[in-house]
Amino acid sequence: MSWRSESIWIEFITGSRKTSNFCWAFILFLGSLGFLLVGTSSYLGRNFISVFASQQIIFFPQGIVMSFYGIAGLFISCYLWCTFLWNVGSGYDLFDRKEGIVRIFRWGFPGKSRRIFLRFLMKDIQSIRIEVKEGVSARRVLYMEIRGQGAIPLIRTDENFTTREIEQKAAELAYFLRVPIEVF
């Protein structure tokens, strides 16, 4: 989603608060909880899950391995839930021609760098760069090349834009900023 006027362009960036991330966190939580329950029931000799008898799974080595996978899955699930709740990666890109300033804001993990705020002068922007890699794991990324800073990604790599859409977005942004486009 974006908002534009003659002198200001604001591009809102969706972070990790997506339906797919929610589904993966939920599925991983349920699966790892199941593994942990099976491992615990094999250790205690009681049936926590009524699908099979606890005597079918011997604690050493199957029960230990299932408990380990359950605990590891719960940690990964906790990480996914935290990134989902904190909305890591969301923010905005603000291009202001009137002031000649570009502001990039992203939410990070809690701590010193929770708020990531970058500010550049428009005259320091060298170009808008498109990186396209076709194949099995196709990747299309839009970068802003800054003098002395390198390339800053403007679009998340997991967003599946077509080549036409990324070219259109790059052309509009390059026209607005009055900079050239580079393709790699």
Swiss-Prot record:
One of its GO terms (cellular component) is chloroplast thylakoid membrane. One of its GO terms (biological process) is photosynthesis. It is a multi-pass membrane protein. The chain crosses the membrane at residues 22-42, 57-77. It is found in: Plastid, Chloroplast thylakoid membrane. Keywords: Chloroplast, Membrane, Photosynthesis, Plastid, Thylakoid, Transmembrane, Transmembrane helix. HAMAP family: Ycf4. Seems to be required for the assembly of the photosystem I complex. Belongs to the Ycf4 family. This is Photosystem I assembly protein Ycf4. The lineage of its organism: Eukaryota, Viridiplantae, Streptophyta, Embryophyta, Tracheophyta.
